[in-house]
Amino acid sequence: MSDIHEHKILILDFGSQYTQLIARRIREIGVYCELWAWDVTEAQIREFAPNGIILAGGPESVTAENSPRAPEYVFTAGVPVLGICYGMQTMSEQLGGKVIQGVGEGEFGYAQIEMLTDSLLFKGIEDAVNSEGKPLLDVWMSHGDKVSAIPEGFVAVAKTDTCPFAAMANEEKQFFGVQFHPEVTHTRQGMRMLSHFALDICGCAANWKPSSIIEDAIERLKKQIGDDEVILGLSGGVDSSVVAMLLHRAIGKKLTCVFVDNGLLRLNEAEQVMEMFGDHFGLNIIHVDAENRFLDAMKGEADPEAKRKIIGRVFVEIFDEESKKCANAKWLAQGTIYPDVIESAGSATGKAHVIKSHHNVGGLPDDMELGLVEPLRELFKDEVRKIGLELGLPYNMLYRHPFPGPGLGVRVLGEVKKEYCDLLRRADAIFIEELHKADLYNKVSQAFTVFLPVRSVGVMGDGRKYDWVVSLRAVETVDFMTAHWAHLPYDFLGRVSNRIINEVDGISRVVYDISGKPPATIEWE
Protein backbone atom coordinates (compact mmCIF):
# COMPACT_ATOMS: atom_id res chain seq x y z
CA MET A 1 0.00 0.00 0.00
CA SER A 2 1.44 3.40 -0.98
CA ASP A 3 1.97 5.85 1.89
CA ILE A 4 -0.66 8.56 1.41
CA HIS A 5 1.34 10.92 3.65
CA GLU A 6 4.65 10.39 1.82
CA HIS A 7 4.30 13.57 -0.26
CA LYS A 8 2.86 16.60 1.47
CA ILE A 9 2.46 20.36 1.36
CA LEU A 10 2.58 22.66 4.39
CA ILE A 11 0.25 25.67 4.33
CA LEU A 12 1.02 28.50 6.74
CA ASP A 13 -2.05 30.44 7.84
CA PHE A 14 -1.87 34.23 8.19
CA GLY A 15 -5.57 34.60 8.96
CA SER A 16 -7.26 34.73 5.55
CA GLN A 17 -10.85 33.55 5.25
CA TYR A 18 -9.72 31.51 2.22
CA THR A 19 -6.93 29.50 3.89
CA GLN A 20 -8.97 26.33 4.48
CA LEU A 21 -10.04 26.56 0.85
CA ILE A 22 -6.38 26.35 -0.26
CA ALA A 23 -5.99 23.15 1.77
CA ARG A 24 -9.16 21.67 0.27
CA ARG A 25 -7.95 22.49 -3.26
CA ILE A 26 -4.56 20.83 -2.68
CA ARG A 27 -6.35 17.75 -1.32
CA GLU A 28 -8.66 17.73 -4.39
CA ILE A 29 -5.55 17.63 -6.57
CA GLY A 30 -4.66 14.43 -4.68
CA VAL A 31 -1.91 15.67 -2.37
CA TYR A 32 -1.96 15.56 1.43
CA CYS A 33 -1.46 18.92 3.14
CA GLU A 34 -1.72 20.40 6.60
CA LEU A 35 -2.65 23.87 7.73
CA TRP A 36 -0.53 25.42 10.51
CA ALA A 37 -0.38 28.84 12.13
CA TRP A 38 2.35 31.09 10.66
CA ASP A 39 4.40 31.14 13.88
CA VAL A 40 5.67 27.55 13.69
CA THR A 41 9.26 26.69 14.59
CA GLU A 42 12.01 25.46 12.32
CA ALA A 43 12.04 22.17 14.26
CA GLN A 44 8.32 21.62 13.57
CA ILE A 45 8.77 22.25 9.84
CA ARG A 46 11.79 19.93 9.70
CA GLU A 47 9.85 17.19 11.45
CA PHE A 48 6.90 17.55 9.06
CA ALA A 49 9.34 17.51 6.10
CA PRO A 50 7.05 19.05 3.46
CA ASN A 51 7.74 18.79 -0.29
CA GLY A 52 6.59 22.39 -0.65
CA ILE A 53 5.26 25.30 1.41
CA ILE A 54 2.37 27.68 0.69
CA LEU A 55 2.20 31.05 2.47
CA ALA A 56 -1.50 31.92 2.57
CA GLY A 57 -3.23 35.30 2.64
CA GLY A 58 -4.18 37.37 5.67
CA PRO A 59 -5.88 40.58 6.79
CA GLU A 60 -2.78 42.30 8.27
CA SER A 61 -0.45 44.74 6.53
CA VAL A 62 3.18 43.72 5.97
CA THR A 63 4.07 47.40 6.42
CA ALA A 64 2.78 47.41 10.02
CA GLU A 65 5.09 46.79 12.95
CA ASN A 66 4.81 43.29 14.45
CA SER A 67 2.73 41.97 11.55
CA PRO A 68 3.09 38.20 10.95
CA ARG A 69 6.15 36.90 9.10
CA ALA A 70 7.02 33.51 7.67
CA PRO A 71 9.69 31.64 9.67
CA GLU A 72 13.09 32.37 8.03
CA TYR A 73 13.61 28.62 7.63
CA VAL A 74 10.86 28.55 4.98
CA PHE A 75 13.30 30.22 2.55
CA THR A 76 16.32 28.05 3.42
CA ALA A 77 14.59 24.65 3.61
CA GLY A 78 15.36 23.91 -0.04
CA VAL A 79 11.72 23.28 -1.05
CA PRO A 80 9.47 25.25 -3.43
CA VAL A 81 7.46 28.08 -1.85
CA LEU A 82 4.26 29.71 -3.16
CA GLY A 83 3.14 33.00 -1.60
CA ILE A 84 -0.52 33.94 -2.07
CA CYS A 85 -1.65 37.58 -1.54
CA TYR A 86 -0.26 38.48 1.94
CA GLY A 87 2.01 35.45 1.51
CA MET A 88 3.57 37.01 -1.60
CA GLN A 89 3.98 40.34 0.20
CA THR A 90 5.76 38.88 3.22
CA MET A 91 7.95 36.75 0.93
CA SER A 92 8.92 39.87 -0.99
CA GLU A 93 9.59 41.93 2.16
CA GLN A 94 11.57 39.16 3.88
CA LEU A 95 13.76 38.49 0.84
CA GLY A 96 14.69 42.15 0.24
CA GLY A 97 11.82 43.49 -1.87
CA LYS A 98 9.44 46.31 -0.94
CA VAL A 99 5.74 46.50 -0.10
CA ILE A 100 3.78 49.76 0.00
CA GLN A 101 0.49 50.50 1.67
CA GLY A 102 -2.37 50.84 -0.78
CA VAL A 103 -4.00 54.26 -0.63
CA GLY A 104 -7.31 53.91 -2.45
CA GLU A 105 -5.62 51.70 -5.04
CA GLY A 106 -6.55 48.25 -3.76
CA GLU A 107 -8.04 45.63 -6.03
CA PHE A 108 -11.08 43.72 -4.81
CA GLY A 109 -12.95 41.23 -6.95
CA TYR A 110 -12.50 40.26 -10.60
CA ALA A 111 -9.32 41.37 -12.37
CA GLN A 112 -7.47 40.46 -15.54
CA ILE A 113 -3.72 39.99 -15.31
CA GLU A 114 -1.36 40.31 -18.27
CA MET A 115 1.41 37.69 -18.46
CA LEU A 116 4.84 39.27 -18.96
CA THR A 117 7.02 36.15 -19.18
CA ASP A 118 6.83 32.36 -19.00
CA SER A 119 6.81 30.62 -15.63
CA LEU A 120 6.49 26.99 -14.53
CA LEU A 121 3.53 27.98 -12.37
CA PHE A 122 1.55 29.26 -15.38
CA LYS A 123 2.73 26.73 -17.99
CA GLY A 124 0.15 26.35 -20.76
CA ILE A 125 -2.42 28.54 -18.98
CA GLU A 126 -4.27 31.43 -20.60
CA ASP A 127 -7.88 32.68 -20.67
CA ALA A 128 -7.55 35.26 -23.45
CA VAL A 129 -4.94 37.18 -25.49
CA ASN A 130 -4.59 40.97 -25.70
CA SER A 131 -3.96 43.06 -28.82
CA GLU A 132 -0.19 42.60 -28.41
CA GLY A 133 -0.53 38.81 -28.26
CA LYS A 134 0.15 38.63 -24.52
CA PRO A 135 -1.79 35.96 -22.57
CA LEU A 136 -4.42 37.24 -20.11
CA LEU A 137 -5.80 35.43 -17.07
CA ASP A 138 -9.07 36.00 -15.21
CA VAL A 139 -8.33 36.12 -11.47
CA TRP A 140 -9.81 37.17 -8.13
CA MET A 141 -8.03 39.93 -6.20
CA SER A 142 -8.47 41.02 -2.59
CA HIS A 143 -5.64 43.34 -1.54
CA GLY A 144 -4.92 46.88 -0.43
CA ASP A 145 -1.10 46.78 -0.12
CA LYS A 146 1.10 45.80 -3.06
CA VAL A 147 4.67 44.83 -3.87
CA SER A 148 6.50 47.88 -5.27
CA ALA A 149 9.93 46.25 -5.74
CA ILE A 150 10.67 42.53 -6.06
CA PRO A 151 13.64 40.83 -4.37
CA GLU A 152 16.90 40.13 -6.20
CA GLY A 153 16.73 37.00 -8.36
CA PHE A 154 12.98 37.41 -9.01
CA VAL A 155 11.27 38.45 -12.25
CA ALA A 156 7.88 40.06 -12.77
CA VAL A 157 5.62 37.38 -14.26
CA ALA A 158 2.30 39.26 -14.50
CA LYS A 159 0.80 42.72 -13.94
CA THR A 160 -2.49 44.63 -13.90
CA ASP A 161 -3.06 48.33 -14.63
CA THR A 162 -2.58 49.26 -10.96
CA CYS A 163 -0.40 46.39 -9.73
CA PRO A 164 3.03 46.11 -11.44
CA PHE A 165 3.76 42.77 -9.74
CA ALA A 166 0.60 40.65 -9.86
CA ALA A 167 2.88 37.59 -9.94
CA MET A 168 6.62 37.11 -9.44
CA ALA A 169 9.01 34.16 -9.61
CA ASN A 170 12.52 33.05 -8.81
CA GLU A 171 12.52 29.95 -11.01
CA GLU A 172 15.97 28.84 -9.84
CA LYS A 173 14.96 28.67 -6.16
CA GLN A 174 11.38 27.73 -7.11
CA PHE A 175 9.89 30.63 -5.15
CA PHE A 176 6.64 31.98 -6.61
CA GLY A 177 4.32 34.79 -5.53
CA VAL A 178 0.81 35.64 -6.75
CA GLN A 179 -1.12 38.70 -5.59
CA PHE A 180 -4.46 37.08 -6.48
CA HIS A 181 -6.26 34.05 -4.99
CA PRO A 182 -5.88 30.90 -7.14
CA GLU A 183 -7.93 28.89 -4.62
CA VAL A 184 -11.26 30.64 -5.28
CA THR A 185 -13.41 29.53 -8.21
CA HIS A 186 -13.48 33.09 -9.65
CA THR A 187 -9.82 32.57 -10.64
CA ARG A 188 -10.79 30.48 -13.65
CA GLN A 189 -7.63 28.38 -13.93
CA GLY A 190 -6.57 28.54 -10.29
CA MET A 191 -6.77 24.78 -9.86
CA ARG A 192 -4.32 24.30 -12.74
CA MET A 193 -1.85 26.71 -11.10
CA LEU A 194 -2.10 24.91 -7.76
CA SER A 195 -1.78 21.59 -9.58
CA HIS A 196 1.39 22.81 -11.35
CA PHE A 197 2.79 23.81 -7.97
CA ALA A 198 1.94 20.63 -6.05
CA LEU A 199 2.53 18.00 -8.74
CA ASP A 200 5.06 19.48 -11.20
CA ILE A 201 7.11 21.93 -9.13
CA CYS A 202 7.04 20.12 -5.75
CA GLY A 203 7.09 16.67 -7.39
CA CYS A 204 4.26 15.25 -5.27
CA ALA A 205 2.38 12.14 -6.41
CA ALA A 206 -1.43 12.27 -6.33
CA ASN A 207 -1.86 9.51 -3.70
CA TRP A 208 -4.55 11.22 -1.65
CA LYS A 209 -7.80 9.65 -2.89
CA PRO A 210 -10.85 8.12 -1.12
CA SER A 211 -9.93 4.44 -1.64
CA SER A 212 -6.36 5.00 -0.34
CA ILE A 213 -7.60 7.11 2.60
CA ILE A 214 -9.99 4.30 3.62
CA GLU A 215 -7.24 1.68 3.34
CA ASP A 216 -4.89 3.82 5.41
CA ALA A 217 -7.56 4.60 8.05
CA ILE A 218 -8.48 0.93 8.49
CA GLU A 219 -4.82 -0.04 8.81
CA ARG A 220 -4.24 2.64 11.46
CA LEU A 221 -7.42 1.76 13.37
CA LYS A 222 -6.40 -1.91 13.56
CA LYS A 223 -2.98 -0.87 14.86
CA GLN A 224 -4.37 1.60 17.41
CA ILE A 225 -7.20 -0.57 18.77
CA GLY A 226 -5.78 -4.09 18.53
CA ASP A 227 -8.25 -6.54 20.09
CA ASP A 228 -9.97 -3.92 22.27
CA GLU A 229 -13.62 -2.86 22.05
CA VAL A 230 -14.84 0.58 20.97
CA ILE A 231 -17.96 2.61 21.78
CA LEU A 232 -19.37 5.28 19.44
CA GLY A 233 -22.23 7.75 19.76
CA LEU A 234 -24.03 7.31 16.43
CA SER A 235 -26.34 10.20 15.53
CA GLY A 236 -27.10 9.31 11.93
CA GLY A 237 -25.24 12.45 10.82
CA VAL A 238 -22.46 12.35 8.21
CA ASP A 239 -19.43 12.28 10.52
CA SER A 240 -20.55 9.65 13.03
CA SER A 241 -21.97 7.48 10.22
CA VAL A 242 -18.66 7.43 8.33
CA VAL A 243 -16.75 6.72 11.58
CA ALA A 244 -19.13 3.81 12.23
CA MET A 245 -18.52 2.35 8.76
CA LEU A 246 -14.73 2.68 9.01
CA LEU A 247 -14.65 1.03 12.44
CA HIS A 248 -17.04 -1.70 11.30
CA ARG A 249 -14.64 -2.51 8.45
CA ALA A 250 -11.64 -2.43 10.77
CA ILE A 251 -12.89 -4.25 13.89
CA GLY A 252 -16.36 -5.63 13.07
CA LYS A 253 -18.38 -6.68 16.10
CA LYS A 254 -15.90 -5.14 18.55
CA LEU A 255 -17.67 -1.83 17.85
CA THR A 256 -20.76 -0.90 19.86
CA CYS A 257 -22.78 2.07 18.60
CA VAL A 258 -25.08 3.97 20.96
CA PHE A 259 -27.95 5.68 19.14
CA VAL A 260 -29.80 8.10 21.42
CA ASP A 261 -33.26 9.00 20.13
CA ASN A 262 -33.88 12.33 21.86
CA GLY A 263 -37.31 12.90 20.31
CA LEU A 264 -35.88 15.90 18.43
CA LEU A 265 -35.07 14.13 15.17
CA ARG A 266 -36.65 14.40 11.71
CA LEU A 267 -39.70 12.31 10.71
CA ASN A 268 -38.92 8.55 10.89
CA GLU A 269 -35.20 9.30 11.33
CA ALA A 270 -34.70 6.92 14.28
CA GLU A 271 -36.27 4.03 12.34
CA GLN A 272 -34.14 4.84 9.28
CA VAL A 273 -30.89 4.89 11.30
CA MET A 274 -31.69 1.55 12.96
CA GLU A 275 -32.73 -0.03 9.66
CA MET A 276 -29.68 1.16 7.72
CA PHE A 277 -26.94 0.52 10.27
CA GLY A 278 -28.49 -2.36 12.19
CA ASP A 279 -30.42 -4.38 9.61
CA HIS A 280 -28.62 -3.45 6.38
CA PHE A 281 -24.99 -3.03 7.45
CA GLY A 282 -25.17 -5.35 10.47
CA LEU A 283 -23.62 -3.03 13.06
CA ASN A 284 -24.02 -3.68 16.75
CA ILE A 285 -26.33 -0.83 17.92
CA ILE A 286 -27.90 0.01 21.26
CA HIS A 287 -31.07 2.04 20.63
CA VAL A 288 -31.90 4.32 23.58
CA ASP A 289 -35.40 5.81 23.41
CA ALA A 290 -34.92 8.92 25.54
CA GLU A 291 -37.63 11.23 24.16
CA ASN A 292 -39.40 11.70 27.51
CA ARG A 293 -36.16 12.27 29.36
CA PHE A 294 -35.10 15.09 27.04
CA LEU A 295 -38.55 16.70 26.94
CA ASP A 296 -38.89 16.52 30.75
CA ALA A 297 -35.48 18.14 31.17
CA MET A 298 -36.49 21.03 28.88
CA LYS A 299 -39.92 21.59 30.44
CA GLY A 300 -40.61 25.30 30.94
CA GLU A 301 -37.32 26.39 29.30
CA ALA A 302 -37.64 28.89 26.44
CA ASP A 303 -34.09 30.28 26.19
CA PRO A 304 -32.24 28.86 23.13
CA GLU A 305 -28.80 28.69 24.77
CA ALA A 306 -30.22 27.04 27.89
CA LYS A 307 -32.03 24.49 25.70
CA ARG A 308 -28.77 23.67 23.89
CA LYS A 309 -26.99 23.15 27.21
CA ILE A 310 -29.76 20.90 28.58
CA ILE A 311 -29.77 18.77 25.42
CA GLY A 312 -25.97 18.45 25.58
CA ARG A 313 -26.00 17.60 29.29
CA VAL A 314 -28.72 14.92 29.02
CA PHE A 315 -26.95 13.34 26.04
CA VAL A 316 -23.71 13.11 28.03
CA GLU A 317 -25.53 11.57 31.01
CA ILE A 318 -27.17 8.91 28.83
CA PHE A 319 -23.97 8.17 26.93
CA ASP A 320 -22.09 7.82 30.21
CA GLU A 321 -24.70 5.37 31.54
CA GLU A 322 -24.60 3.28 28.37
CA SER A 323 -20.81 3.24 28.19
CA LYS A 324 -20.64 1.84 31.73
CA LYS A 325 -22.75 -1.10 30.52
CA CYS A 326 -20.09 -1.77 27.85
CA ALA A 327 -17.55 -2.74 30.49
CA ASN A 328 -15.04 -4.07 27.94
CA ALA A 329 -14.89 -0.88 25.87
CA LYS A 330 -11.44 0.70 26.06
CA TRP A 331 -11.91 3.33 23.37
CA LEU A 332 -14.35 6.12 22.57
CA ALA A 333 -14.72 6.96 18.86
CA GLN A 334 -15.57 10.50 17.77
CA GLY A 335 -16.37 12.21 14.48
CA THR A 336 -13.86 15.06 14.93
CA ILE A 337 -12.94 16.46 11.48
CA TYR A 338 -9.99 18.61 10.37
CA PRO A 339 -11.70 22.04 10.68
CA ASP A 340 -12.45 21.18 14.36
CA VAL A 341 -8.74 20.44 14.86
CA ILE A 342 -7.71 23.70 13.16
CA GLU A 343 -10.18 25.74 15.23
CA SER A 344 -9.06 24.14 18.49
CA ALA A 345 -5.37 24.59 17.72
CA GLY A 346 -5.60 28.30 16.97
CA SER A 347 -2.31 30.13 16.93
CA ALA A 348 0.33 30.40 19.61
CA THR A 349 0.15 34.17 19.25
CA GLY A 350 -3.57 34.33 19.83
CA LYS A 351 -4.23 35.78 16.36
CA ALA A 352 -6.76 33.04 15.56
CA HIS A 353 -10.31 33.60 16.70
CA VAL A 354 -12.00 31.23 19.10
CA ILE A 355 -14.93 29.55 17.37
CA LYS A 356 -18.03 28.32 19.23
CA SER A 357 -17.82 24.92 20.89
CA HIS A 358 -19.24 22.04 18.87
CA HIS A 359 -22.29 20.06 19.94
CA ASN A 360 -20.29 16.84 20.01
CA VAL A 361 -19.48 14.17 22.55
CA GLY A 362 -16.63 16.50 23.52
CA GLY A 363 -18.13 17.22 26.92
CA LEU A 364 -17.98 13.65 28.16
CA PRO A 365 -17.06 13.10 31.83
CA ASP A 366 -13.35 13.10 32.66
CA ASP A 367 -13.67 9.87 34.62
CA MET A 368 -14.63 7.81 31.55
CA GLU A 369 -11.00 6.72 31.18
CA LEU A 370 -11.41 5.73 27.56
CA GLY A 371 -8.80 6.27 24.85
CA LEU A 372 -9.88 8.51 21.97
CA VAL A 373 -10.28 7.23 18.40
CA GLU A 374 -10.73 9.96 15.76
CA PRO A 375 -10.37 8.44 12.28
CA LEU A 376 -11.61 11.59 10.48
CA ARG A 377 -9.40 14.16 12.19
CA GLU A 378 -7.31 14.72 9.04
CA LEU A 379 -10.31 15.16 6.74
CA PHE A 380 -12.44 18.05 5.51
CA LYS A 381 -16.23 17.58 5.31
CA ASP A 382 -16.24 17.12 1.52
CA GLU A 383 -13.62 14.36 1.90
CA VAL A 384 -15.68 12.66 4.63
CA ARG A 385 -18.66 12.58 2.23
CA LYS A 386 -16.58 11.07 -0.61
CA ILE A 387 -15.30 8.39 1.75
CA GLY A 388 -18.85 7.70 2.90
CA LEU A 389 -19.90 7.06 -0.71
CA GLU A 390 -16.96 4.71 -1.20
CA LEU A 391 -17.99 2.85 1.98
CA GLY A 392 -21.49 2.30 0.60
CA LEU A 393 -23.50 4.96 2.45
CA PRO A 394 -26.38 6.41 0.38
CA TYR A 395 -25.83 9.70 -1.47
CA ASN A 396 -29.04 11.32 -0.19
CA MET A 397 -27.96 10.71 3.40
CA LEU A 398 -24.41 12.04 2.93
CA TYR A 399 -25.43 15.13 0.97
CA ARG A 400 -28.61 16.17 2.76
CA HIS A 401 -28.87 19.65 4.22
CA PRO A 402 -27.24 20.45 7.59
CA PHE A 403 -29.28 19.60 10.69
CA PRO A 404 -28.40 21.24 14.03
CA GLY A 405 -26.93 19.09 16.82
CA PRO A 406 -29.80 19.95 19.20
CA GLY A 407 -32.24 19.05 16.38
CA LEU A 408 -35.80 20.31 16.66
CA GLY A 409 -34.87 21.67 20.10
CA VAL A 410 -33.79 24.86 18.32
CA ARG A 411 -36.40 24.72 15.54
CA VAL A 412 -39.31 24.79 17.97
CA LEU A 413 -39.13 28.38 19.21
CA GLY A 414 -39.57 28.81 22.94
CA GLU A 415 -40.56 25.85 25.11
CA VAL A 416 -40.24 22.44 23.44
CA LYS A 417 -43.24 20.09 23.71
CA LYS A 418 -43.92 16.73 22.08
CA GLU A 419 -47.03 18.10 20.35
CA TYR A 420 -44.97 20.90 18.75
CA CYS A 421 -42.21 18.49 17.63
CA ASP A 422 -44.73 16.10 16.05
CA LEU A 423 -46.42 18.92 14.10
CA LEU A 424 -43.08 20.35 13.00
CA ARG A 425 -41.73 16.96 11.88
CA ARG A 426 -44.70 16.39 9.57
CA ALA A 427 -44.68 19.94 8.15
CA ASP A 428 -40.92 19.78 7.53
CA ALA A 429 -41.19 16.39 5.80
CA ILE A 430 -43.77 17.84 3.37
CA PHE A 431 -41.51 20.84 2.59
CA ILE A 432 -38.47 18.61 1.94
CA GLU A 433 -40.49 16.11 -0.11
CA GLU A 434 -41.85 18.90 -2.33
CA LEU A 435 -38.35 20.37 -2.80
CA HIS A 436 -37.16 16.98 -4.06
CA LYS A 437 -40.19 16.59 -6.35
CA ALA A 438 -39.64 20.04 -7.88
CA ASP A 439 -35.89 19.34 -8.30
CA LEU A 440 -35.12 22.28 -6.00
CA TYR A 441 -33.56 20.45 -3.04
CA ASN A 442 -30.00 20.52 -4.40
CA LYS A 443 -30.43 24.07 -5.72
CA VAL A 444 -30.74 25.48 -2.20
CA SER A 445 -28.05 25.10 0.46
CA GLN A 446 -30.37 24.50 3.39
CA ALA A 447 -34.13 24.27 3.83
CA PHE A 448 -36.21 23.56 6.91
CA THR A 449 -39.37 24.46 8.80
CA VAL A 450 -39.61 26.35 12.10
CA PHE A 451 -42.45 26.01 14.62
CA LEU A 452 -43.69 29.38 15.96
CA PRO A 453 -45.41 29.30 19.36
CA VAL A 454 -48.25 31.58 18.22
CA ARG A 455 -51.80 30.68 17.26
CA SER A 456 -53.57 32.15 14.26
CA VAL A 457 -57.19 32.04 13.11
CA GLY A 458 -57.98 29.87 10.11
CA VAL A 459 -61.15 28.81 8.30
CA MET A 460 -61.73 25.14 7.46
CA GLY A 461 -65.06 24.39 5.74
CA ASP A 462 -67.73 26.24 7.70
CA GLY A 463 -65.73 26.33 10.91
CA ARG A 464 -63.00 28.55 12.28
CA LYS A 465 -59.91 27.07 13.81
CA TYR A 466 -57.30 28.63 16.00
CA ASP A 467 -54.07 26.75 15.32
CA TRP A 468 -50.30 27.03 15.16
CA VAL A 469 -48.03 28.81 12.65
CA VAL A 470 -44.91 27.43 10.93
CA SER A 471 -42.31 29.27 8.89
CA LEU A 472 -40.49 27.81 5.90
CA ARG A 473 -36.82 28.78 5.56
CA ALA A 474 -34.59 28.18 2.51
CA VAL A 475 -31.21 29.81 1.88
CA GLU A 476 -28.48 29.89 -0.74
CA THR A 477 -24.90 30.18 0.49
CA VAL A 478 -21.35 29.17 -0.38
CA ASP A 479 -19.86 29.00 3.11
CA PHE A 480 -22.78 29.48 5.57
CA MET A 481 -21.03 32.64 6.85
CA THR A 482 -23.36 34.78 4.73
CA ALA A 483 -26.56 33.67 2.99
CA HIS A 484 -29.36 34.91 0.73
CA TRP A 485 -32.94 33.76 1.17
CA ALA A 486 -33.87 31.46 -1.70
CA HIS A 487 -36.28 32.94 -4.25
CA LEU A 488 -38.47 29.84 -4.52
CA PRO A 489 -41.32 30.00 -7.10
CA TYR A 490 -44.64 31.29 -5.75
CA ASP A 491 -46.60 28.33 -7.10
CA PHE A 492 -44.20 25.97 -5.34
CA LEU A 493 -44.60 27.83 -2.02
CA GLY A 494 -48.37 27.79 -2.49
CA ARG A 495 -48.33 24.03 -3.03
CA VAL A 496 -46.25 23.42 0.11
CA SER A 497 -48.48 25.72 2.18
CA ASN A 498 -51.68 24.01 0.98
CA ARG A 499 -50.34 20.56 1.73
CA ILE A 500 -49.16 21.48 5.24
CA ILE A 501 -52.43 23.20 6.21
CA ASN A 502 -54.57 20.39 4.76
CA GLU A 503 -52.49 17.43 5.92
CA VAL A 504 -51.16 18.54 9.30
CA ASP A 505 -54.05 18.97 11.71
CA GLY A 506 -53.00 21.68 14.14
CA ILE A 507 -51.33 24.12 11.72
CA SER A 508 -53.44 26.92 10.28
CA ARG A 509 -50.87 29.26 8.73
CA VAL A 510 -47.58 28.94 6.80
CA VAL A 511 -45.20 31.88 6.30
CA TYR A 512 -41.94 32.17 4.32
CA ASP A 513 -38.82 33.71 5.88
CA ILE A 514 -37.21 36.30 3.56
CA SER A 515 -34.31 37.37 5.80
CA GLY A 516 -30.69 37.24 4.66
CA LYS A 517 -27.62 36.54 6.80
CA PRO A 518 -26.60 39.05 8.03
CA PRO A 519 -28.57 40.42 9.79
CA ALA A 520 -30.55 37.24 10.52
CA THR A 521 -28.84 33.92 11.28
CA ILE A 522 -29.77 30.88 9.19
CA GLU A 523 -31.34 29.00 12.10
CA TRP A 524 -33.92 30.96 14.11
CA GLU A 525 -32.38 30.00 17.46
UniProtKB/Swiss-Prot annotation:
SUPFAM superfamilies in UniProt: Adenine nucleotide alpha hydrolases-like, Class I glutamine amidotransferase-like, GMP synthetase C-terminal dimerisation domain
GO cellular component term of the entry, any: cytosol
Primary enzyme class: ligase
E.C. code: 6.3.5.2
Catalytic residues (UniProt): 85 (nucleophile), 181, 183
Keyword list, A-Z: ATP-binding, Glutamine amidotransferase, GMP biosynthesis, Ligase, Nucleotide-binding, Purine biosynthesis
Pathway named in the protein's UniProt entry: Purine metabolism; GMP biosynthesis; GMP from XMP (L-Gln route): step 1/1
Residues that hold ATP according to the record: 235-241
The organism's place on the tree of life at top rank: Bacteria
Catalytic activity: XMP + L-glutamine + ATP + H2O = GMP + L-glutamate + AMP + diphosphate + 2 H(+)
Domain GMPS ATP-PPase: 208-400
Gene Ontology molecular function: ATP binding; GMP synthase activity
InterPro entries named among the record's database cross-references: Class_I_gatase-like, GATASE, GMP_synth_C, GMP_synth_GATase, GMP_synthase, GMPS_ATP_PPase_dom, NAD/GMP_synthase, Rossmann-like_a/b/a_fold
Glutamine amidotransferase type-1 domain mapped to chain residues: 8-207
Keyword Transcription regulation (UniProt): no
NCBIfam families listed in its UniProt record: guaA_Cterm, guaA_Nterm, PRK00074.1
Family matches, as PANTHER family: GMP SYNTHASE [GLUTAMINE-HYDROLYZING], GMP SYNTHASE-RELATED
Quaternary structure (record): Homodimer.
Role noted for this protein: Catalyzes the synthesis of GMP from XMP.
Protein name from the UniProt record: GMP synthase [glutamine-hydrolyzing]
Biological source species: Shewanella baltica (strain OS155 / ATCC BAA-1091)
Gene: guaA
